[in-house]
């Protein structure tokens, strides 16, 4: 029987297909950088032609890449489409790259989705990493510290953050009581995110922030439209054809960024109308003081039109990260009531019921602090940092890494590494306490990865940790959280730039006592 009866293609078609395959193979092979003598490329698992490893990553890239690291080591390479991506796991390897070789790994890849964040001018997402970027980052850091964790001489509170959080936590307690008197239940994230946004809004804009306006509420309650497309491994960043196909998630992402930028731009412009450089009251005012009109900056001055970009980064990152942390904390507390009771016992013993918690109480509340650390570790709700890229040819752990290589930092793997934690799947706050149980095991706490490391480390890390602590301390002093019997709480993370839990609308809060 003739071979042609089994083959549905002509000889010409087979030759043409073979030629195309060889051409694609040659192009992909030729696109790989030459490795200097004596070095080697990172190990790379087998991937599909043209697709690379995108199918392997699936819906939970942090889990897939953690499994790969067990087989191939802390430095491995994958391909998304034809783009090589370096994946780093393991605390020591990540510290080597981001801290000891920080200048080599401080870049950002020029990804398509990043161009829609503050029109591609984001301090956090843009590829810039030179002297101008560094100066603006320092300016933003100083402004943030001055009007958050620095002391406030005009207030009885220890700092601006304590003043704003105390006010918003009290308002949140009142709002939750109203919901319990009405519907009798609530969604914790929807309530917490408004309070957190009001705090960062007050620090950014002072009295100019449109607190709880319809526009602001719409933005903060729909932040998932941002995080679902800004996550590491978004196919639209690696397969250009997807940009021209129907993509509802991408359209929501674009629309959200436009609305968010317009909202902040309007608020910044209104603030500037009565700005007084001799009476700076908030972060935006501090940025105005170090700005100049015109498109170019000189020295430590920045163009006024760029201020909204810095405010966008500060406001956007802080409200989403902190609200997500507090919401995850409440989810753990209702599933583990014994931990909630232990925290409240500590609060009653240290603070009592005659005053509200303050930031200065933090060292005396080690179990609450240990619970927060374990929430950060166990949820790992920031599974990857924003992707990095290499600024020059370099080596890491004996592997050659070319310039402009996209780099994924797997924070989830570090937080669930059995070599670090022993029983990473267990939720156990006690792991962060010293043997006496009275202080935090600081060396162990510093192994948690949530805010990145090195030159791209989150500038709001200290603010975020303080704010989560104070919100939880005030809420748990007065309220006991629960869900009705029979209601299942789903703690499965939903992948994104920040991983949310499934919404739970059946939360309840009981007032433990009232302040007179």
From Swiss-Prot:
Topology of this chain in the membrane: Peripheral membrane protein
UniProt protein name: Cytochrome P450 1A2
Signal peptide location: none
Originating organism: Macaca fuscata fuscata
Glycosylated residues (UniProt): 69
Reactions catalysed, as given in the entry: an organic molecule + reduced [NADPH--hemoprotein reductase] + O2 = an alcohol + oxidized [NADPH--hemoprotein reductase] + H2O + H(+); 17beta-estradiol + reduced [NADPH--hemoprotein reductase] + O2 = 2-hydroxy-17beta-estradiol + oxidized [NADPH--hemoprotein reductase] + H2O + H(+); 17beta-estradiol + reduced [NADPH--hemoprotein reductase] + O2 = 4-hydroxy-17beta-estradiol + oxidized [NADPH--hemoprotein reductase] + H2O + H(+); estrone + reduced [NADPH--hemoprotein reductase] + O2 = 2-hydroxyestrone + oxidized [NADPH--hemoprotein reductase] + H2O + H(+)
Record has Cell wall biogenesis/degradation as a keyword: no
Cross-referenced PROSITE patterns: CYTOCHROME_P450
GO biological process, one term: estrogen metabolic process
Subunit annotation: Interacts with PGRMC1; the interaction requires PGRMC1 homodimerization.
Keywords assigned by UniProt, alphabetized: Endoplasmic reticulum, Fatty acid metabolism, Glycoprotein, Heme, Iron, Lipid metabolism, Lyase, Membrane, Metal-binding, Microsome, Monooxygenase, Oxidoreductase, Steroid metabolism, Sterol metabolism
Cross-referenced InterPro entries: Cyt_P450 (IPR001128), Cyt_P450_CS (IPR017972), Cyt_P450_E_grp-I (IPR002401), Cyt_P450_E_grp-I_CYP1 (IPR008066), Cyt_P450_sf (IPR036396)
Pfam families from the UniProt entry: p450
PANTHER family in the record: CYTOCHROME P450 1A, STEROID 17-ALPHA-HYDROXYLASE/17,20 LYASE
Gene3D superfamilies reported in the protein's UniProt record: Cytochrome P450
Claim: Endoplasmic reticulum is one of the keywords in the record: yes
Cofactor(s) this protein cannot do without: heme
Binding site for heme: 458
UniProt subcellular location: Endoplasmic reticulum membrane; Microsome membrane
The protein's annotated pathway: Cofactor metabolism; retinol metabolism; Steroid metabolism; cholesterol metabolism; Lipid metabolism; arachidonate metabolism
EC number: 1.14.14.1, 4.2.1.152
Role noted for this protein: A cytochrome P450 monooxygenase involved in the metabolism of various endogenous substrates, including fatty acids, steroid hormones and vitamins. Mechanistically, uses molecular oxygen inserting one oxygen atom into a substrate, and reducing the second into a water molecule, with two electrons provided by NADPH via cytochrome P450 reductase (NADPH--hemoprotein reductase). Catalyzes the hydroxylation of carbon-hydrogen bonds. Exhibits high catalytic activity for the formation of hydroxyestrogens from estrone (E1) and 17beta-estradiol (E2), namely 2-hydroxy E1 and E2.
Record-level GO cellular component terms: endoplasmic reticulum membrane
Similarity comment: Belongs to the cytochrome P450 family.
MF-aspect GO terms: estrogen 16-alpha-hydroxylase activity; estrogen 2-hydroxylase activity; heme binding; hydroperoxy icosatetraenoate dehydratase activity; iron ion binding; steroid 17-alpha-monooxygenase activity
Gene field: CYP1A2
